[in-house]
UniProtKB/Swiss-Prot annotation:
Keywords: Antibiotic resistance, Methyltransferase, Plasmid, RNA-binding, S-adenosyl-L-methionine, Transferase, Transposable element
Protein name, per record: rRNA adenine N-6-methyltransferase
Gene symbol of the encoding locus: ermF
GO molecular function per UniProt: RNA binding; rRNA (adenine-N6,N6-)-dimethyltransferase activity
Record organism: Bacteroides fragilis
InterPro entries associated with the record: KsgA/Erm, rRNA_Ade_diMease-like_C, rRNA_Ade_Mease_Trfase_CS, rRNA_Ade_methylase_Trfase_N, SAM-dependent_MTases_sf
Gene Ontology BP, a term: response to antibiotic
Amino acid sequence: MTKKKLPVRFTGQHFTIDKVLIKDAIRQANISNQDTVLDIGAGKGFLTVHLLKIANNVVAIENDTALVEHLRKLFSDARNVQVVGCDFRNFAVPKFPFKVVSNIPYGITSDIFKILMFESLGNFLGGSIVLQLEPTQKLFSRKLYNPYTVFYHTFFDLKLVYEVGPESFLPPPTVKSALLNIKRKHLFFDFKFKAKYLAFISYLLEKPDLSVKTALKSIFRKSQVRSISEKFGLNLNAQIVCLSPSQWLNCFLEMLEVVPEKFHPS
């Protein structure tokens, strides 16, 4: 009798079978009986089966047709589980607060991050994500060259909980993995400005080797740059990529106040 193999999809999905990892992911996400939780790339339902015991509502999102059928049979009697068969990039993300606990398809990590931490900024509360180690480590570089990474750190506390070995998955991946915890910060920010804020970051990072002083002078007057430096404790001689997320946000908010809109980056 031939042993049935689990499918390995083009998106790089590897199924979590480590019960300790599953327990830690759920604990780190601080799930309550009031939460709606998305399980992106639900696979065989190894995470979903634990989430449904805690969360108010679990949405298991899976793109593999055979696995979608399996999930629907497995959770046919679970009133708080909704199985959605689609690529997460085409999924209608909730317009209300939600969390994510997921072992995501590694191949679409960047897209998932953008959907959660940029497009869904107003409703994504955070959670736990198991993903490839390399892109996780890039989130914690001392110098941030990627505008989206600056954006994510502005609005979320990101924590690399620990590295995860290949033996925690079926089939075992050839790359190292990690457990990432995400918590949204409590900031007073009008989310209608999120695209403008990203444009502001992107504009100033076009020449990442410029000093903070030189980069800011492309938007602010010389006297305004000096004032901003004193107000927010900026090192004007440091590279622009060395600004902290809070300094980025403060500079942006200052631009909204003192720079005419026609001079704002777009």
